[in-house]
Amino acid sequence: SPASGISKMDEWHVSVVAETGSTNDDLLRAAEQGELADRTVLRTEHQTAGRGRLDRRWDAPAGSNLLASMYLMSPGDRPTSMLQRVGVAIVDAVNQLAGLKIEASNRATLGLKWPNDVLYDGRKLAGVLAQRSTSAPGLIVGFGVNVAWAPPEAARVNDLVDCTAEQLLVEVLTAFDAQSGDPAVLAQAYRARL
C-alpha cells in the first residue's frame, strides 16, 4: 500500500461518458449485474436525470460541472459515513486547488452543511448522495459540484479557483484517499468543516 500522502489514483477505475441519465443509476445497474470493480468512478459531461437528496433534480449545462459517482465495495461502510467522507474530500480538494488552509477562519467561507451539502459563502457548491443496492454489495456515492456554472442562488468552484471538472475529480479522489478510515477520526474531520 502506498505511503500516506502518495497518490493512489492508479487504484481508481475512472470512466468518462459524454451524457447519461444518472451516474448513480448506471453504477447501481452495473453493480447489480456484478460488473463493477471496487473503486469504480463514472464521470459524465452531462446528466439528464441527475438528482439530489429527496429526489431533487440536479441539472447543469453540458461540460460545466463535476458530475460523478463512485462504487465502493466496503459492506461495513455506512452510507452516512461515506456521505461525510466524500463531503470532506470535496471541501479539502477545493481548498487544495485554491491554496487555502483547513482552519477555523475558512470554515465560514467554505464548509459543510449537514447532511450532504458543501457551501461557499452560504451558497450551495456541491451535493452528495449515497445509495445501496438491495441485491449487490457495496455503496454508490454520487456527487455534483458546480465548477464553471451554477444556478443564481448557488456558488461555483471557479469563484475560488480556475480549474476543470477533471482536475477537481483527481483532487477529490486524492483527498478521499488521504482520510482515515477510522469512523471517529472521520466524524471529527466532518465536524471540523461544519
What name fits each language-model region?
Residues 1-7, 75-109, 120-194:
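Long, positively charged amphipathic alpha-helical accessory segments at protein N-termini or as interdomain linkers
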Residues 1-109:
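N-terminal lobe of the biotin/lipoate ligase/transferase fold
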